[in-house]
Amino acid sequence: MMFNNENYKDYDQELWEAIQAEEDRQEHNIELIASENMVSKAVMQAQGSVLTNKYAEGYPSKRYYGGTEYVDIVESLAIERAKKLFGAAYANVQPHSGSQANAAAYMALINAGDTVLGMDLAAGGHLTHGSPVNFSGKTYQFVGYTVDKETEKLDYAAILKQAKAVQPKLIVAGASAYSRKIDFEQFRFIADQVGAYLMVDMAHIAGLVAAGLHQNPVPYAHIVTSTTHKTLRGPRGGLLLTNDEAIARKMNAAIFPGLQGGPLEHVIAAKAVAFKEALDPAFTDYARAVIANTAAMAEVFAKDDRFRLISGGTDNHLFLVDVTKVIENGKLAQALLDEVNITLNKNAIPFETLSPFKTSGIRIGCAAITSRGMGVDESRTIAHLIIKTLVNHQQPEILEEVRYEVRRLTDAFPLYKKN
């Protein structure tokens, strides 16, 4: 029977209204969640293509189904572009997410119960870097490294000392809430000193790496994992890279048949579009603007003694702010800013004293506002609006002023221009 529901707006009004409301929210909110970005219409078009109909277990030219000659072309394009973008010999574009990419990397390199040294969640790590509530912490024996208590930056000498003490089989470098550059060459040196593998999770900084604005981990790590959204500005998904042929075979087997069945070829097509966009010289300009906007916004907080900028600054697309001098915790700050249409997230800070459900800090990222075309002036304005909201959170008339200014900014920089 043929479909008679070509227009989902008419067929499923409930769903259409929810999606329309989300479109309006994105259009009229200032998005500062560091793990979010705004993709191009080309990325969305590829993801919404007929490729969603096709099952394709296996890899290009080695499928378990017929009729895959065209998805082979699509996936091969994505693979070759990813390799070129990051200077890698091998790439796997099938992971459905960064978490699954990390799981595959672990499966490829180590065994259940092995000791792993990874960044502590409170210091800026990710759930998949050994949190006890995550599969990583349940499957492997993770030991967390942290940052220096005074500088709030990575202390490579201390990490080396810790690595020698615990003798891990794997060291994980990379973070989800660390605002400074990470020296992957130093991490490889540490790994070699103890005979460990090095895995780098570059999910947050992949776009900056692609643009040549952060050290590329591929020459140093045994495996590099990433998401394809965040600063890379692609669809939500994962990526694996390596220069080692034997490890490439293991990581491919870990994804399929180890963790996943059929790949999402429509998402892989969208990844291919995003990789092509990132190979364009204009993407480097975008990444430079992200860093400049983040630095400009962070500087406003650094100059206000009512707030504390974690580590004193930022080198990438995000930074953390301790807000406890002006408001009880990060959870309340997040909720208040939601009320004025500024979206960010509460976040633990190094050596956190509050519950992870409350936190002392907030995390701010500038990738999404940069995608809208906002610059350093707008970034400073947004920082002042955040401060104005948190300092005057008990004054409704002030909050209304902030809402007006937020709407003025979003109207001036529309997300997707209407045809």
Curated annotation (Swiss-Prot):
HAMAP family: SHMT. Its EC number is 2.1.2.1. It is an enzyme of class 2 (transferase). It is found in: Cytoplasm. The record marks 229 as: Plays an important role in substrate specificity. Belongs to the SHMT family. Catalyzes the reversible interconversion of serine and glycine with tetrahydrofolate (THF) serving as the one-carbon carrier. This reaction serves as the major source of one-carbon groups required for the biosynthesis of purines, thymidylate, methionine, and other important biomolecules. Also exhibits THF-independent aldolase activity toward beta-hydroxyamino acids, producing glycine and aldehydes, via a retro-aldol mechanism. GO terms for cellular component: cytosol. Its main location: cytoplasm. This is Serine hydroxymethyltransferase. (6S)-5,6,7,8-tetrahydrofolate binds at residues 121, 125-127, 355-357. Disulfide bonds: none annotated. The lineage of its organism: Bacteria, Bacillati, Bacillota, Bacilli, Lactobacillales. Homodimer. Pfam families: SHMT (PF00464). It catalyses: (6R)-5,10-methylene-5,6,7,8-tetrahydrofolate + glycine + H2O = (6S)-5,6,7,8-tetrahydrofolate + L-serine. Its cofactor is pyridoxal 5'-phosphate.
